[in-house]
């Protein structure tokens, strides 16, 4: 391959190459019309512009070349037939890609010079379907990419760029499509892959950066980096990892920051200079050699990058890649320090009756559970074998592997004697797998076929020591086969580090003479392979060695044999990890007998055997069974035990420890020194992500119990004056949400503070009265609703009038640091602090009180003296300008830049919404109530959004240092049992009263307005709206100002059409009983149960809404189109959409009064007060459109 691009990037001066900016952003500023796209049906299909308006695309290319870009990308991001099919343009894919490449090359020729050649990258986006989630099969995706690559290649691009990758299986399909076209053409082009890491730190399907590198490392790509989703700040850690570990050139093409919704449009704040400074660091310190811009970047951004690129030298990198397997989530390195790679053996239909029975029953869920159990036992890779006579193994492998990929975090070893089955697994498993296995038993054809698919899918390979004459039984024969296979595999292009030799552990337990040497032969073969082929790995199926023995004897013999093999170089084994014993736990006599058996140390007198270790081993284990080890806890000093009680949230034995401590210390000393020290550790663990919130609350409950036990032993003065400070907290007027406020109460009160908790819906008068009574050191206001933030600001104005100046903490989901530190701080004379979470409040108080006590706090200036200089804790800067508390200031939009022109209301119906579709007939007109007796919770539980419950409500968040595998194991072992327990409790004690009112109202649209008519009127008129009918209600909806120009009214038949359409409405609640029971738990200091139940009630209300919407779809006749899994349901992959007032598509909360009036929700005890708060708290409402084009959007 001759490539001017590679010559340039690998030239001695190691230049930094600059890619262009955002194609979409810079097409939008041209204000293209539907006609420019070739008609309304193609509007939004940027790829079609190379045919309908090529000058628009050429303008973008020229602007970026003029700015100094070295490379522009073709306008083919969505250029596969699969994506173009959404516009009925699938058959144009080859032509559009070729035309786009030729267009970009023509513009490049206008700018290219010998000193600064210009290049064109063929852009290949991710498409709209993720193969790992089953949206599209691997072969279809690969075939679609083949068409695109042919067009780009024939159009003359200089390199191919697979970009914005969200799914590693999608990347493999693209890369293998590219390789197919290269084989057709007899030549290659440079390859670049750019993955997209979302704000949560992984790709969309959950892949970590290390896993992405492990998966892509086997492929012949030239550049690997990141683009899209975030700005450069959130890319830093990923780029750093690539810098240190990737063998490829590193690229970084960020957005201009994170997008924000400003006036209904995506707005990117990062300025050209800010982008320039960030990428300058990446070049000089991390060795990045390819830079550019993604969403929101304009020519001025690219000019800023080009200005620095010509003068900067990338840091010389010395990357070290550790050979690894990977799931779609995380990596597993092959090398294990002082141990071996554990490959779980129980998911094997050839060797496990349990697995075979489950496979025959096609009980896929139980097979997945069997896999998960091996994760708990310590397996690091899962061996997956579905070989069973009479079954369709290709289908079985696809079915099982596709489930394992999304449910188990370990890499897979696909195990079969037939390569077709292994490939079936590779087509659904996007991680880096290992193939088990190939050998020469059927000659070289099958041997090379397995190598071929290993190379194609980037997999490791197990090679058994078997040739055309059968299994190698002697050490010499085993090594001879290994050496032959090694030379062939290396010549084929398989790296030595990806080869696992299996020298075959054959039974030594049969008593057959020719089997006596099997153990020694295997050990000797391992030693020789390790010495002469040192870069390869050596794997064994250990349990074969003990075939036929008593289970207890097998466990010991397997453990001793494993140890012997490790000593001479074995580094991987297929075993049940929980069935291997450490040598220290094996009786010395048993050890010796096993060694004698492995090395065939029988003793003879003449021909008579006087000592047979096999016989001895059988005798030693006669009647014995396997036993599990139970270890006791160490005895700790009472001081340390008290601390551990708090940290572990363990109340068992607490009173005994406290009684012991009372003999040595005063009660206050026990609290202030040892118990609070434990709570301090809890706070540190929570802050570093090592402890989840529910466990923090367990610690708080234990702390509360300890203090309650000690109080009778205290003097009255001690009990009254012990508080570190006083903290006043309230949820503001009109807001019933108290979970966040109560968590602050729990954390502060159990860290030595006196907390005055006023409760929910507190008007400012109550807060002021409480202030005057308790004289708190700090006031905190909480609220979940957007409207609550306005009340907070109003309250601050009243505080000023009342002369209140103490620091005020504001907390709640609707708040942002910018609103607190700009709007609210400018309102209040004292200091305003953004309360990110309960521990942020605690940290502030822990600094405030000693500062006040040492006269280093001023209500107007904030911290003074030494306290004002501690990093992250300043409330004011040195010059007195107000800033935040430990949070980096946000960039603000210059108001003068915003448009001041009067708004013209657009009421023209969107052409993106098809008006000609069959309108359903509802089963009834009007409303219907479903009481608790009509609703089975067993039908609602499966619709729980577990991500929202576990992470959002219960706050079981994955710590950054925890692997995906460890996190999933934690959820399986700790969190799912909690959910199961609460499901049972809710059912047994009738703690939720699910109630629904829903209905169907006749409607028609008129511009941006939806007209609602009397259901009785339509019922009396044969289901039709009379022409002279008067609407009983109207809803006015906003319209998008650009793009598809959607408005909710567009989804319904127009008044002009005369068609009667259907407007479904719903309101659901789990009842006031949920609110009352949550209050009871909190009042009883049952903090953890309070968190669990409150969170579950909130999410059950959401699940009930999903259940009701599902019922409506079924009643309207298209429920059969629903997906068959909860994930797709929650991602709105059904027909139509559900909207709630207050959100961008229908923002007017006043309309909810009308909705509740139509549904007459007071009949189920659901209402909304004057502050627009719905009661009971755990309730939701929604309006529904059944139109296929209806999805969430911002207007």
From Swiss-Prot:
PROSITE patterns: ADOMET_ACTIVATION, B12_BINDING, B12_BINDING_NTER, HCY, PTERIN_BINDING. This is Methionine synthase. L-homocysteine is bound via the zinc atom. It catalyses: (6S)-5-methyl-5,6,7,8-tetrahydrofolate + L-homocysteine = (6S)-5,6,7,8-tetrahydrofolate + L-methionine. Pathway: Amino-acid biosynthesis; L-methionine biosynthesis via de novo pathway; L-methionine from L-homocysteine (MetH route): step 1/1. It comes from Synechocystis sp. (strain ATCC 27184 / PCC 6803 / Kazusa). GO terms for biological process: homocysteine metabolic process; methionine biosynthetic process; methylation; tetrahydrofolate metabolic process. It comes from the Bacteria. Binds 1 zinc ion per subunit. S-adenosyl-L-methionine binds at residues 945, 1138, 1192-1193. The gene is metH. Residues 629-722 form the B12-binding N-terminal domain. Keywords: Amino-acid biosynthesis, Cobalamin, Cobalt, Metal-binding, Methionine biosynthesis, Methyltransferase, Repeat, S-adenosyl-L-methionine, Transferase, Zinc. Methylcob(III)alamin binds at residues 734-738, 782, 838.
């Amino acid at each position: 391959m001759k490539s001017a691009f590679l010559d340039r990037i690998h030239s001695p001066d190691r230049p930094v190459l600059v890619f262009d900016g955002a194609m979409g952003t810079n097409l939008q500023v041209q204000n293209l019309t539907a006609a420019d796209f070739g008609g309304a049906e193609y509007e939004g299909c940027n790829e079609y512009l190379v045919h309908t308006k090529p000058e628009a695309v050429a303008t973008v290319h020229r602007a970026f070349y003029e700015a100094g870009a070295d490379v522009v990308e073709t306008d083919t991001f969505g250029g596969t037939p699969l994506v173009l099919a959404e516009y009925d343009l699938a058959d144009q894919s080859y032509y559009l890609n070729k035309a786009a490449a030729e267009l970009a090359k023509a513009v490049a020729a206008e700018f290219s010079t010998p000193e600064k050649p210009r290049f064109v990258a063929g852009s290949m986006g991710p498409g709209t379907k993720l193969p790992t989630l089953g949206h599209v099969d691997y072969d279809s995706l690969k075939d679609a990419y083949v068409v695109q690559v042919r067009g780009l290649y024939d159009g003359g691009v200089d390199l191919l760029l697979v970009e914005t990758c969200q799914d590693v299986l999608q990347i493999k399909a693209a890369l293998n499509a590219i390789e197919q076209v290269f084989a057709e053409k007899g030549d290659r082009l440079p390859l670049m892959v750019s993955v997209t890491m979302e704000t949560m730190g992984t790709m969309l399907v959950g892949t970590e950066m290390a896993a992405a590198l492990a998966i892509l490392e086997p492929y012949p790509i030239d550049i690997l980096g990141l683009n899209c989703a975030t700005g450069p700040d959130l890319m830093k850690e990923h780029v750093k990892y690539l810098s240190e570990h990737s063998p490829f050139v590193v690229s970084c093409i960020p957005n201009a920051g994170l997008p924000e919704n400003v006036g209904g449009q995506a707005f990117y704040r990062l300025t050209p200079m800010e982008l320039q400074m960030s990428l300058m660091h990446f070049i000089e310190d991390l060795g990045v050699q390819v830079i550019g811009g993604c969403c929101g970047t304009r020519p001025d951004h690219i000019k800023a990058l080009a200005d620095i690129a010509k003068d900067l030298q990338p840091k010389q990198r010395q990357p070290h890649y550790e050979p690894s397997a990977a799931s779609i989530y995380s990596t597993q390195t092959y090398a294990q320090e002082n141990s071996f790679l554990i490959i779980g053996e129980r998911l094997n239909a050839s060797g496990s009756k349990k697995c075979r029975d489950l496979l025959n029953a096609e009980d896929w869920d139980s097979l997945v559970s069997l896999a998960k159990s091996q994760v708990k036992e310590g397996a690091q890779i899962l061996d997956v074998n579905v070989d069973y006579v009479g079954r369709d193994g290709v289908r079985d492998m696809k079915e099982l592997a596709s489930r394992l990929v999304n449910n188990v975090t370990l890499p897979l070893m696909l195990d079969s004697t037939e390569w077709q089955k292994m490939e079936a697994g590779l087509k659904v498993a996007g991680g880096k797998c290992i193939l088990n296995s190939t050998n020469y038993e059927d000659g070289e054809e099958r041997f090379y076929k397995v190598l071929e698919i290993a190379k194609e899918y980037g997999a490791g390979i197990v090679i058994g020591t078997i040739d055309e004459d059968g299994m190698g039984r002697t050490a010499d024969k085993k090594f001879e086969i290994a050496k032959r296979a090694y030379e062939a595999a290396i010549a084929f292009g398989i790296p030595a580090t990806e080869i696992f030799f299996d020298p075959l552990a054959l039974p030594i337990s049969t008593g057959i003479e020719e089997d006596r040497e099997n153990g020694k032969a295997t050990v000797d073969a391992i030693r020789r392979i390790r010495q002469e082929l040192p870069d390869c790995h050596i794997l064994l199926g250990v349990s074969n060695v003990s075939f036929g023995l008593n289970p207890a004897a097998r466990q010991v013999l397997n453990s001793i044999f494993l140890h012997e093999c490790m000593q001479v170089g074995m580094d991987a084994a297929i075993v049940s990890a929980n069935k291997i014993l450490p040598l220290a736990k094996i009786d010395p006599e048993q050890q010796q007998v096993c060694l004698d058996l492995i090395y065939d140390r029988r003793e003879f007198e003449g021909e008579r055997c006087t000592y047979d270790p096999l016989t001895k081993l059988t005798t030693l284990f006669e009647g014995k069974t396997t036993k599990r080890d139970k270890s006791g806890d160490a005895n700790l000093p009472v001081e340390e035990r008290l601390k551990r009680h708090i940290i572990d949230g363990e109340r068992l034995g607490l009173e005994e420890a406290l009684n012991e401590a009372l003999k040595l210390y005063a009660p206050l000393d026990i609290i202030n020194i040892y118990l609070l020290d434990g709570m301090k550790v809890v706070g540190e663990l929570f802050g570093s992500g090592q402890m989840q919130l529910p466990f923090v609350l367990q610690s708080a409950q234990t702390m509360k119990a300890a203090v309650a036990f000690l109080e009778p032993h205290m003097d009255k003065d001690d009990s009254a004056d012990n508080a570190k400070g006083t903290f006043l907290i309230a949820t503001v007027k009109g807001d019933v949400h108290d979970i966040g406020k109560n968590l602050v109460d729990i954390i502060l009160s159990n860290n030595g503070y006196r907390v005055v908790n006023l409760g929910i819906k507190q008007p400012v008068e109550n807060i002021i009265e409480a202030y005057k009574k308790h004289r708190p050191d700090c006031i905190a206001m909480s609220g979940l609703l957007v409207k609550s933030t306005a009340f907070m600001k109003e309250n601050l104005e009243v505080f000023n009038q009342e002369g209140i100046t103490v620091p005020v903490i504001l907390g709640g989901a609707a708040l942002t640091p910018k609103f607190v530190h700009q709007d609210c701080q400018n309102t209040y004379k004292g200091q305003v602090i953004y309360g990110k979470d309960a521990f942020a409040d605690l940290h502030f108080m822990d600094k405030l009180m000693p500062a006040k006590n040492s006269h280093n706090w001023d209500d107007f200036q904030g911290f003074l003296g030494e306290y004002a200089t501690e990093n992250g804790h300043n409330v004011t800067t040195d010059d007195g300008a107000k800033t935040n508390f430990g949070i980096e200031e946000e960039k603000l939009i210059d108001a003068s830049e915003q448009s001041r022109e009067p708004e013209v209301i657009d009421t023209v119906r969107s052409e993106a919404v098809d008006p000609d579709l069959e309108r359903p007939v509802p089963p009834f007109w009007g409303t219907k109530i479903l009481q608790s007796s009509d609703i089975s919770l067993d039908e609602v539980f499966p619709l729980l959004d577990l991500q929202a419950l576990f992470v959002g409500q219960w706050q079981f968040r994955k710590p950054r240092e925890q692997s995906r595998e460890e996190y999933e194991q934690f959820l399986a072992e700790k969190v799912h049992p909690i959910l199961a327990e609460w499901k049972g409790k809710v059912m047994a004690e009738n703690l939720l009263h699910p109630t629904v009112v829903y209905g169907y109202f006749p409607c028609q649209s008129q511009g941006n307005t939806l007209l609602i008519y009397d259901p009785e009127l339509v019922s009396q008129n044969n289901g039709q709206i009379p022409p002279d009918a008067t609407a009983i209600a109207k809803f006015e909806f906003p319209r998008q100002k650009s793009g598809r120009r959607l408005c909710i009214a567009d989804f319904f038949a127009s008044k002009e059409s005369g068609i009667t359409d259907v407007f479904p409405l719903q309101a659901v609640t789990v009842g006031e009983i949920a609110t009352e029971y949550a209050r009871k738990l909190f009042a009883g200091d049952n903090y953890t149960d309070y968190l669990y139940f409150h969170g579950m009630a909130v999410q059950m209300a959401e699940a009930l809404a999903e259940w009701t919407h599902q019922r409506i779809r079924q009643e309207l006749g298209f429920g059969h189109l629903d997906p068959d899994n909860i994930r797709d349901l929650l991602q709105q992959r059904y027909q139509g959409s559900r909207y709630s007032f207050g959100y961008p598509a229908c923002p007017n909360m006043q309309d909810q009064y009308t909705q509740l009036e139509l549904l007459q929700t007071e009949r189920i005890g659901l209402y909304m007060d004057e502050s627009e708060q719905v009661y009971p708290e755990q309730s939701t409402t929604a309006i529904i459109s059944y139109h296929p084009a209806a999805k969430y959007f911002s207007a």
